[in-house]
């Protein structure tokens, strides 16, 4: 008898027997993932609820209708689009240590060539997104917790500062750190991030008051290059640069300030285990969904 791994959902409508095998394989894959990951329920009830929502055993109870993370949703975390720097432990003092190195980071932005849009999955084939491919450029310093070759080429003092950044360390989900360049007139259409366990920080390298970001129903506008922007990208958000100069910022992930140390450790372990499952038996988890679309 064929293994579920041999099933291919192609061609004609599968028979009822084959459909049953496919559904069983998907259910077994989901069960394996749930059993492997529900250890987080012993860390906190809200992490246990997170796993139930992820595997479709509970419906998410979003605190705000404009918040819809596509991957991980942890209930009972403070839900608001923007945060003050004082709410994020250690961030203000770290940014002060970064100030002397802004020119070095700005130089990276001036030669950035990578199309950041290509980092997204399942983007709609819309003119706004296609146009953005040449207008939103980037250079990664850290991706999935791994240092890039560009990071390794930085001056030793800057590397030391970046290595002490208060990042949300839960690879391969996070952290990400990159220099982001938005060309004059560029517009990033509204979209949701993938989790609410972390916040996104923008450190200005070259900004103008005509560059802004909207998250939820609030808008942040740059007033000067000494400020920082912290927002929850699980909210619907968009950005635009209405000036005639490029906007260049350093972007990175930090933990949501409501999470305890134990929850952060649990999430780091969770992301590692999820990646193993997702790249293995987890590939079968959506077979029945694909079948229903046929």
What feature does the model see in each segment?
Residues 98, 174-176, 185, 198-202, ...:
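Extracellular structured ligand-interaction cores
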């Amino acid at each position: 008898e064929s293994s579920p791994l041999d099933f291919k959902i192609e061609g004609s409508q599968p028979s009822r027997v084959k459909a049953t095998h496919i559904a069983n394989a998907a259910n077994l894959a989901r069960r394996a993932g749930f059993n492997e990951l529900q250890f987080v329920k012993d860390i906190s009830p809200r992490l246990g609820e997170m796993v139930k929502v992820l595997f479709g055993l509970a419906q998410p109870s979003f605190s705000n209708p404009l918040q819809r993370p596509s991957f991980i949703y942890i209930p009972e975390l403070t839900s608001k689009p923007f945060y003050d720097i004082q709410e994020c432990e250690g961030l203000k003092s770290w940014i002060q240590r970064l100030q002397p190195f802004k020119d070095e980071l700005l130089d990276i932005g001036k030669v950035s060539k990578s199309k950041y849009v290509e980092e997204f999955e399942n983007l709609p084939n819309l003119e706004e997104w296609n146009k953005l491919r040449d207008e939103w450029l980037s250079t990664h310093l850290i991706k999935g917790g791994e240092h890039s070759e560009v990071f390794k080429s930085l001056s030793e003092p800057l590397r030391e500062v970046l290595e002490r950044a208060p990042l949300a360390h839960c690879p391969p989900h996070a952290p990400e750190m990159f220099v982001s360049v938005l060309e004059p007139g560029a517009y990033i259409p509204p979209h949701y991030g993938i989790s609410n366990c972390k916040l996104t920080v923008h450190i200005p390298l070259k900004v103008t008051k005509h560059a802004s970001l909207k998250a939820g129903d609030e808008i942040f506008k740059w007033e000067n290059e000494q400020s920082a922007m912290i927002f929850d990208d699980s909210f619907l958000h968009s950005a635009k640069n209405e000036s005639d100069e490029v906007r260049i910022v350093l972007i990175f992930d930090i933990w949501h300030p409501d999470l305890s140390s134990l929850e952060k450790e649990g999430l780091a372990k969770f992301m590692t285990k999820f990646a193993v499952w997702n790249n293995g038996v987890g590939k079968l988890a959506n077979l029945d969904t694909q079948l229903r679309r046929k």
